[in-house]
Amino acid sequence: MKDDLKKIVIENFESSSGNKLQNFQLSYQFFGKRLGTAPVILINHALTGNSIVSGKDGWWSEIVGINRAIDLNKFTVLCINIPGNGFNEEDFNFSVELDLGDVAHIFIKVLDKLKISKLYAIIGGSIGGCLTWEMAAIKNDIAERIIPVASDWKANDWLIANTFLQDRILENSKDPIGDARIHAMTFYRTPESLNQRFSRSMNNEKGIFNVESWLDHHAIKLNQRFSLSSYKFLNKLLRSANITRDESRLETKIMPSKSEIHIISVDSDIFFLPDEDRMTTKRLKKQKVKIKNHVIESIHGHDAFLIETKQISDIFTKILI
């Protein structure tokens, strides 16, 4: 699928911190119908994800595909690699100062260069959902449907605390990527999920608990496909999520929007808390914003947005009519 990767250059961009970037290169992929022949859906990937959202290696292939909930017979799907994610990037400057709002501005410039004036929907999971909020706050009429999944419009103190610990692990561990991944898996899932799956069973060959073997497996896998610089950079982007960083209010940022907003929460998520989504929905409903909070029921916590594909597909099928 890397063969389908396309490159685009943003000639001039000034970040919120005043950095002037010349010839800033990004990569992206299209899936489904040829651009200009069908409604366009932008899908923003998660922290360790990339633009391969569909197909054999796609991280959402059960949701995005021919005759799937996001039907590639009906839609053009675009996925842009978040700068710094390391996917086919050979010379990315990791010292560049960007926040998630900057990335949103850059993505909007990509859409402009591709001559996509309006999207049918923006969908994003985890940090991709935060990015979806950021794009909607910058350009209120960017899409007919705004669909953040297992995410929020800001990094709350709990998320900041976890990204702070992730950063400490990445700076100080002998196996920074592996150990940070092990820590992350404990808040991407839930106690109930792990207890039900492993039941204190042992890996007799290794002489360790199966839950430990499983965590080691995830650590090894991420080491094979993710760089330390990318992990640090994306972790920093995640903690910067905040559409009100200019000290405005949520309502002020979103109220001009005529888009439908569909927040998809996970009832057991201990990373992006469903209570925060309920509060956001309540606040924006008071302002007559067209908003609905959909809930995935799962024991699996944050990662349910990758696991509970049937529930997510059912929700998307109702939204993307």
What do these predicted regions represent?
Residues 257, 263-265:
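Short beta-strand/loop motif that positions the catalytic acidic residue
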Residues 142-221:
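Alpha/beta-hydrolase-fold enzymes
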Residues 270-279:
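Conserved alpha/beta-hydrolase "acid-adjacent" motif
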Residues 117-157:
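Conserved hydrolase catalytic core segment
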Residues 101-120:
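Conserved acidic catalytic loop of the alpha/beta-hydrolase fold
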Residues 29-87:
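N-terminal cap/lid subdomain of alpha/beta-hydrolase-fold enzymes
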Residues 1-40:
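Catalytic-loop region of hydrolases
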Residues 278-321:
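Catalytic active-site module of serine/aspartate enzymes centered on a nucleophile-bearing elbow/loop
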